[in-house]
Amino acid sequence: MSETGPSLQRPATRAARLSAIEQALATHIITSQSQLSKILIDEGIAVTQATLSRDLDEMHAVKTRLKDGTVAYAVGRSVVASEGEDVGERGEAQMSRVLNGLVTSVAAAGNLVVVHTPSGAAQYVASVIDKQPIEGVLGTIAGDDTVMVICTNDDTAVSRSDWLLSLASK
């Protein structure tokens, strides 16, 4: 186990590969398919250039020019940050807008964060949390009005609980 927690293990499936590609595009500035291929290999996913090209096409990934002039892949509405730009601020602003009206309480319990919402809103809140690359968060489980955020350890759960509460309070 590393300092940041256990590494994510993925099955050798198409869905897992597409998820890994989406995550790589959201967290790295990817300028070429060979660069993306190397990142996937580091994740334990071997892929041919032809498959990678088809996957990017299917995901509607396009090359876009960043503010600094770099041309990089982006998917849909996602915008990759250039050097020095904080991806977290943009993600926090988006999360804050959603969480502000939907979170009724937040509590840490062991390595979990329990987030309460109005009836019917938990799935949406969990989806918003899952779409952000949040350090120390492994994933979420949602019911009707409760989201369980699974963290790598107890300390991370406490800090993520405080952070989610602050986002919901903005």
Swiss-Prot record:
Pfam families: Arg_repressor (PF01316), Arg_repressor_C (PF02863). GO terms for cellular component: cytoplasm. Keywords: Amino-acid biosynthesis, Arginine biosynthesis, Cytoplasm, DNA-binding, Repressor, Transcription, Transcription regulation. The keyword Transcription applies. This is Arginine repressor. Pathway: Amino-acid biosynthesis; L-arginine biosynthesis [regulation]. It is found in: Cytoplasm. Belongs to the ArgR family. GO terms for molecular function: arginine binding; DNA binding; DNA-binding transcription factor activity. Regulates arginine biosynthesis genes. One of its GO terms (biological process) is L-arginine biosynthetic process.
